Design a protein with these regions (language model features):
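Composition- and surface-driven signal marking solvent-exposed, interaction-prone regions
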Residues: 161, 448, 663-666, 714-716
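Short amphipathic alpha-helix segments
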Residues: 625, 660-682
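Inter-lobe coupling/hinge segments of SF2-like helicase ATPases
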Residues: 200-206, 210, 224-661, 688-690, ...
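Accessory, non-ATPase domains that flank or precede helicase/AAA+ motor cores in DNA-metabolism machines
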Residues: 1-364, 371, 376-391, 674, ...
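Short beta-strand elements
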Residues: 519, 675-687, 727-735
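A broad, structural surface signal
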Residues: 31, 35, 84-91, 173, ...
């Protein structure tokens, strides 16, 4: 018996299966989907490999085939489906097959299972009670405490007995010798759920919500698996629709994956789901320890949980009876993987749903242009929620403030007069507010006022950001240095910080409103494991009046006490060198505005901008997604950008600028030569950040309406990638 095995080495020349003989002792045990150890190379170094398939015929001379060493992970549940998904990702997004396999079916960490010891009674009740009477007469206090405790419950943990009941070892040993108790051990899963959670009442659905739930259930029962887009205004109750669908799925013995874009959302979502579904739900994210993560996956494999919540990695939960995949806030860029394979979670979830005959449900108040276009064309089913779920709650009043006029009138503060007045009013009424600025740090850049040059990162082509504590930080590679006393280039002492970050905003708020209680939420304040939870919990308990932060504060959070949202710089993402910049600006502003007035009090939103006429800002202020969509799709159609045409970015990365440049031009030359009239190339040029972590980056864009030619071009790029690897040049493809 033979096994085709992919070696766990990311190199283009090894991107194929190697055949190994299965030793007789492991025949019947080795299965597709397992991680194994095999001898590899001339020195027969032990390497980890992944079993793709089994066979009885040797592909080469049997005497030349090496023997597999041992199994290191016997997880082969749902193996065929997950192998198929990994192969699809490899073909769709490039890279190596082993890289896709690592994402979809990661090898289990060598984590020791957590064992718990506990005491149980082993004798009949009469004998137990007789001995208890004797122990009382003899004044054996330790034995009496333990036996009395065991009368009230089936078992007592060893830790509880020793620490809380203060039972000494000799008392335990005596009861064991009398065969009145025995020590047992069982596997204990590390908990990642909230320690305390109030019971969440099941909400009555309104007519819109109920109609959508009924339609999705009836179509599911009829065998319809066409993906569905749930499009609803902020606060319209999409989560409650999810909850009712999940409840129905669990009754059908189906399992559910709920994807959320940000780790910061995990706490609130898991709190809601745990309140409704209890121990049936778990979560997974990058903040968990290896042990915690391993335990949650083990529980999923064993069928001990029915719902897994988390960011994109949760998609690969090893459920065996998947029925529903929910992608909440499906438009978010966080669903794009920045690691190879550079997969998109929405598309990958669609493929997994197809392979498992599951339903894919996408939810958003601001759907991606791609998803809404598919819904308009009938590729997706579209369901709409048009009113807020809380009775009496309505969309907030939104005011756009032209900061050019503020400057003309003499106001040089980052707070417009309208925003300052609303903040004073909000504080006077003991209400809460959120202020959004999508840049962390103190000042965006520190420049010399003599020579005009910014202080840059020595490893990246970006300016360092000023942070509190007189330090400069690169937000791309993490490089940190103390604030210099003079310009490194000309020696001038006149250095100044320009631009606004969350730290400076927090300082200015405290200066203007000294009695206000202020919390800041950004990457700096949430770097610890429970950072998000502590800040959000504190704000939810009204221990602060103002929450200032980056985009992590505006996505999906529900604070009924918030009546004011201030967007300090709405233009910040509008003029990025990305054709989706208008879409991202609209989505961010709409999501931010949607945090206000979610309770019974009316909400107000102030959008500060230097470009108030821009259609992204105007339609966001009106909370009018469809108007934005129709204007944006006209632009995409005119430019043949996705979803109208196919487009991807090709990037060459090397420690030597000359090599990166040479290979990106090689890509351009070969594609032009073969597809000159079918595929359009934009570039090559420097990437927006030309040097990142000491690596040079050159890129180009490929655009086409011919799907066949586009796929052939991807295959050609894969061939070039293998050639470039010889010179230590990496070529990455990112689907736009």
């Amino acid at each position: 018996m033979y096994a085709d095995i992919v070696i766990d080495i990311s190199h283009e020349s090894l991107d194929r299966p190697f055949q190994y003989r299965i030793p007789e002792s492991l025949v019947g045990q080795v299965q597709p989907g397992m991680w194994v150890l095999v001898p590899f190379g001339r020195r027969n170094t032990q390497k980890k490999g992944f079993v793709l398939k089994l066979g009885t015929k040797a592909n080469i001379d049997p005497d030349r085939i090496k023997e597999l060493t041992e199994i290191i992970s016997d997880d082969n549940s749902s193996d065929k489906i997950r192998i198929a998904l990994a192969v699809w990702m490899y073909r769709e997004y490039g890279g190596n097959l082993i890289q896709s396999l690592r994402v979809v079916m990661p090898a289990r960490k060598n984590v020791r299972p957590k064992q718990v010891s506990f005491f149980v009674r082993t004798s009949d009740e009469k004998r137990f009670l007789d001995y208890l009477d004797l122990a009382r007469k003899k004044n054996w206090k330790g034995r009496v405490r333990l036996m009395e405790a065991l009368l009230c419950r089936d078992y007592i943990s060893s830790a509880f007995a020793r620490q809380q009941l203060k039972i000494a070892s000799d008392a335990i040993k005596a009861l064991e010798e009398e065969k009145l108790i025995q020590i047992e051990t069982k596997r204990f899963y590390r908990s990642v759920l909230p320690k305390e959670s109030a019971s969440l009442e099941k909400k009555q659905l309104n007519e819109e919500q109920q109609a959508i739930v009924d339609k999705l259930i009836s179509s599911y029962q009829a065998g319809v698996r066409t993906p569905a887009l749930l499009y609803g205004i902020t606060g319209s109750g999409k989560t409650e629709v999810y909850m009712h669908l999940i409840e129905w799925m669990i009754r059908q013995n189906k399992q559910v994956i709920v994807l959320i874009p940000e780790i910061s959302l995990t706490y609130q979502v898991i709190l809601n789901f745990y309140s409704r579904f209890g121990e049936q739900v778990s979560m997974i994210n990058s903040r968990l320890s290896d042990g915690e993560r391993s335990d949650q996956l083990e529980r999923a494999r064993n069928g001990e949980i029915s719902i897994m919540v988390g960011p994109r990695s949760a998609l690969f939960t090893p459920f065996s009876n998947l029925g529903l995949i929910i992608v909440d806030e499906e438009q978010e860029g966080a669903y794009n993987s920045e690691q190879i394979p550079r997969y998109h979670t929405r598309e990958t979830a669609g493929k997994l749903a197809q392979l498992t005959n599951s339903l894919l449900l996408l939810g958003s108040a601001t759907p991606s242009i791609e998803s809404f276009s598919r819904a308009e064309s009938g590729e997706y089913r579209k369901f709409c929620l048009t009113k807020r779920a809380v009775l009496g709650s309505c969309l907030p009043n939104v005011q756009v403030v032209d900061m050019r006029k503020e400057l003309e009138s003499g106001n040089r503060s980052v707070f417009s007069r309208e925003l300052r007045e609303k903040m004073e009013e909000c504080l006077a009424k003991k209400q809460q507010m959120m202020l959004f600025i999508n840049r962390r740090g103190f000042s965006r850049v520190v420049s010399c006022r003599s020579c005009g040059k910014p202080i840059e990162c020595p490893h990246c082509d970006v300016a360092l950001t000023e942070h509190l504590g007189d330090k400069l930080v690169c937000h791309y590679c993490g490089y940190t240095k103390a604030m210099p006393r003079s310009c490194p280039l000309c020696g001038s002492p006149y250095l100044a910080g320009f631009g606004l970050g969350t730290q400076k905003a927090e300082m200015m708020i405290k200066a203007q409103f000294p009695s206000a209680r202020v919390l800041r939420m950004d990457m700096d304040t949430t770097s610890k494991k429970d950072g998000h939870e502590q800040i959000l919990d504190s704000f939810r308990r009204r221990e602060a009046d103002i929450l200032v932060g980056t985009q992590m504060i505006v996505k999906g959070h529900d604070f009924p006490g918030v009546t004011l949202v201030g967007i300090l710089a709405a233009d910040m993402s509008l003029y990025n060198c990305d054709f989706r910049s208008s879409e991202r600006t609209f989505q961010l502003l709409t999501q931010a505005a949607g945090r206000a007035g979610r309770g019974m009090e009316p909400g107000n939103v102030i959008i500060q901008t230097y470009d108030p006429e821009n259609y992204s800002i105007q339609t966001a202020a009106n909370q009018d997604y469809e108007s934005f969509y129709h204007q944006e799709i006209r632009f995409r159609r005119r430019m043949q950008y996705p979803p109208i045409g196919l487009m991807c970015e090709v990037m060459a990365v090397s420690a030597e600028e000359k090599l990166a440049n040479q290979w990106i031009w090689q890509v351009q030359l070969l594609i032009n030569k073969r597809f000159c009239d079918i595929i359009k190339i934009i570039g090559p040029s420097d990437a927006p950040i030309a040097r990142l972590k000491d690596m040079w980056r050159k890129h180009l864009y490929i655009r086409s309406n011919d799907h066949k030619a586009y796929l052939e071009a991807m295959e050609l790029i894969q061939e070039i990638t293998e050639q470039a690897a010889v010179q230590k040049v990496s070529i990455f493809v990112t689907v736009c």
